């Protein structure tokens, strides 16, 4: 592998188009996103996530997102068996940050929409208008079955009908403070929420299937998708094109934000050695659990998030796109991501979050043309 990567050159018009948002996918579950005995082993804590998000804010990251996970994969690493809760975590992080956008994830089978509307309005107040909600339908049956709230396997084929009603109730309550919505899943009777958010509440999703993208095209402000492969930064382009086409049919602009893991070092070879080490320690027992759960949904197409997560190609980090290389190589590849039509941002994970974000801010981001608009750093990280 080459140590240094050539910089891409863009015209001014291209640079304007390629101003890309950067977010951090905070490790709300143990061990982050590496299912490996060779990866850093750690528990999720508020203090860890506080340090991560404050460091990300210092380096001008645009947003931070936490997932929700209610049951893990087990194995030697007890992968994702230990998780914080998304809304309460992000409420705490909203109180200790000042600029970065904050997103929590609602597991919509567990929380009535009127409660989510009120919690979101509360965190909007805490954050000064920096909060938004990521809506997920739920795919891992044991998460909900353990609590007695799994609605039955026909939910796999009706989940976006459910989510459509859910978001309509949210929009009613955030918009006017009142909802009388009547549907198959929800019935509101003069339901009230006040105070309302100080700014329009952003809703984000991660639809990969046709049904998921159609939902995002109608209701989401942007849509997450998986990057694909190792050091193939534009391989997600067909997914972004599908999202762009779906949004055009609704007359809305819904950009794609792409999930990548960054494994960087001084040289390409050093970064590659870390990646190979993580793969060699893959927790096969935990990965078997993931594969088993991905096969439970027999009613959805093969393009769903969980099917990609369980693909054996790079299951050690749930098959998110992986950028492995020197700081210059990673910067070049992220500029390539920004060149894909419809790609408006990336959501990043790291093998080691604290050092990864610092290296990104100090060594990678300054080389990225799609981040050249940022001001110079003027203060130390707390």
UniProtKB/Swiss-Prot annotation:
It is an enzyme of class 1 (oxidoreductase). GO terms for biological process: alkanesulfonate catabolic process; nitrogen utilization; uracil catabolic process. Pfam families: Bac_luciferase (PF00296). GO terms for molecular function: alkanesulfonate monooxygenase activity; uracil oxygenase activity. FMN binds at residues 68-69, 134, 143, 159-160, 209. Its EC number is 1.14.99.46. It catalyses: uracil + FMNH2 + NADH + O2 = (Z)-3-ureidoacrylate + FMN + NAD(+) + H2O + H(+); thymine + FMNH2 + NADH + O2 = (Z)-2-methylureidoacrylate + FMN + NAD(+) + H2O + H(+). Keywords: Flavoprotein, FMN, Monooxygenase, NADP, Oxidoreductase. Induction: Up-regulated by the nitrogen regulatory protein C (NtrC also called GlnG) and repressed by RutR. InterPro entries: Luciferase-like_dom (IPR011251), Luciferase-like_sf (IPR036661), Pyrimidine_monooxygenase_RutA (IPR019914), SsuD_RutA_monooxygenase (IPR050172). NCBIfam families: RutA. Belongs to the NtaA/SnaA/DszA monooxygenase family. RutA subfamily. The FMN-N(5)-oxide reacts spontaneously with NADH to produce FMN. Requires the flavin reductase RutF to regenerate FMN in vivo. This is Pyrimidine monooxygenase RutA. It comes from Escherichia coli O81 (strain ED1a).
């Amino acid at each position: 592998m080459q140590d240094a990567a050539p910089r891409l050159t863009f015209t001014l018009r291209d640079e304007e188009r390629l101003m890309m948002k950067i977010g951090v996918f905070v490790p709300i579950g143990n061990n982050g996103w590496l299912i490996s005995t060779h990866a850093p082993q750690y528990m999720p804590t508020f203090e860890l996530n506080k340090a991560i998000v404050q460091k990300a804010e210092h380096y001008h990251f645009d947003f931070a997102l936490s997932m929700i996970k209610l049951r893990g994969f087990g194995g030697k690493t007890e992968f994702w068996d230990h998780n914080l809760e998304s809304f309460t975590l992000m409420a705490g992080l909203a109180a200790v940050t000042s600029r970065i956008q904050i997103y929590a994830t609602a597991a919509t089978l567990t929380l009535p929409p009127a409660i989510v509307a009120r919690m979101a309005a509360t965190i909007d107040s805490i954050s000064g208008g920096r909060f938004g909600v990521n809506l997920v339908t739920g795919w891992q049956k044991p998460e909900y079955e353990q609590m007695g709230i799994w609605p039955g396997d026909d939910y796999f084929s009706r989940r976006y009908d459910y989510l459509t009603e859910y978001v309509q109730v949210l929009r009613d309550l955030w918009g006017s403070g009142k909802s009388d919505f009547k549907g198959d899943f929800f019935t509101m009777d003069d339901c009230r929420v006040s105070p309302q958010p100080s700014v329009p509440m952003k809703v984000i999703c991660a639809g990969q299937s046709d049904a998921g993208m159609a939902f995002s095209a109608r209701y989401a402000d942007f849509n997450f998708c998986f990057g694909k492969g190792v050091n193939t930064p534009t391989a997600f382009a067909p997914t972004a094109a599908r999202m762009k086409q779906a949004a055009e049919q609704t007359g809305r602009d819904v950009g794609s934000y792409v999930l990548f893991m960054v494994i960087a070092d001084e040289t390409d070879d050093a970064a590659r050695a870390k990646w190979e080490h993580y793969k060699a320690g893959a927790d096969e027992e935990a990965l078997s659990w993931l594969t088993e759960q991905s096969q439970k949904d027999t009613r959805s197409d093969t393009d769903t998030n969980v099917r990609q997560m369980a693909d054996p190609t790079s299951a050690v980090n749930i098959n998110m796109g992986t950028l492995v290389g020197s700081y210059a190589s990673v910067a070049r590849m992220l500029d390539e991501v920004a060149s894909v039509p419809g790609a408006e941002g990336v959501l990043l994970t790291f093998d080691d979050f604290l050092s990864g974000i610092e290296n990104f801010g100090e060594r990678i981001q300054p080389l990225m043309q799609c981040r050249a608009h940022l001001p110079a750093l003027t203060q130390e990280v707390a």
